[in-house]
């Protein structure tokens, strides 16, 4: 269910502006996805110029990018993020759907722990309402049970299949992902609460009320929301 689109220039603008908010001595949550990757690369350039920071990656991808950029890494056990910079698959009225890269459980953990959470996105991610499928990470044995529970909530669950191998997508945590289509989500907070209560569900991709700022890259600059 990976969401793509937007121009690379828009992503770079949003990513750079978020990276510019990082100050010397900060601990930074490093998000996952193409726009968050732009921030990681920008932070790497600033580290090369002398910026003293530590990063907490949210996925294998962001960890590898940070290592390539020579950003020193730490963990939530050792430090609390001053700021987290992460992307989104869809943005509506300040709320997000994430998880196209199957990293939303770790992303939410780091993003929610940060003193300040900056979302970076391009214009294609903006929507009047949240309406794309919501990823739910589940314990492998719980997948059929959660699928039935999601259907009972009015959703259409689909076990996410891997693109380059046979079988399902397996997360960095060793779990599976069910993409749950609900159509237009009129009350994201209520749905988030229902999904969180499902036995066997590890984490869902609704990020409700977590973002402090949303930086949207445009052709002319960055729109801050």
Swiss-Prot record:
Active-site annotation: 107
Record region (Disordered): 1-20
InterPro entries for the chain: NagB/RpiA_transferase-like, Ribose5P_isomerase_typA_subgr, Ribose5P_isomerase_type_A
Entry EC number(s): 5.3.1.6
GO molecular function, one term: ribose-5-phosphate isomerase activity
Positions annotated to bind substrate: 32-35, 86-89, 98-101, 125
Cellular component GO terms, alphabetical: cytosol
Catalysis performed (reactions): aldehydo-D-ribose 5-phosphate = D-ribulose 5-phosphate
Listed GO biological process terms: D-ribose metabolic process; pentose-phosphate shunt, non-oxidative branch
Pathway participation: Carbohydrate degradation; pentose phosphate pathway; D-ribose 5-phosphate from D-ribulose 5-phosphate (non-oxidative stage): step 1/1
Record keywords, A-Z: Isomerase
Cysteines paired by S-S bonds: none
Functional summary from the UniProt entry: Catalyzes the reversible conversion of ribose-5-phosphate to ribulose 5-phosphate.
Similarity-based family: Belongs to the ribose 5-phosphate isomerase family.
Subunit organization: Homodimer.
NCBIfam families, A to Z: PRK00702.1, rpiA
Descriptive protein name: Ribose-5-phosphate isomerase A
Species this protein is from: Natronomonas pharaonis (strain ATCC 35678 / DSM 2160 / CIP 103997 / JCM 8858 / NBRC 14720 / NCIMB 2260 / Gabara)
Lineage, top ranks: Archaea, Methanobacteriati, Methanobacteriota, Stenosarchaea group, Halobacteria
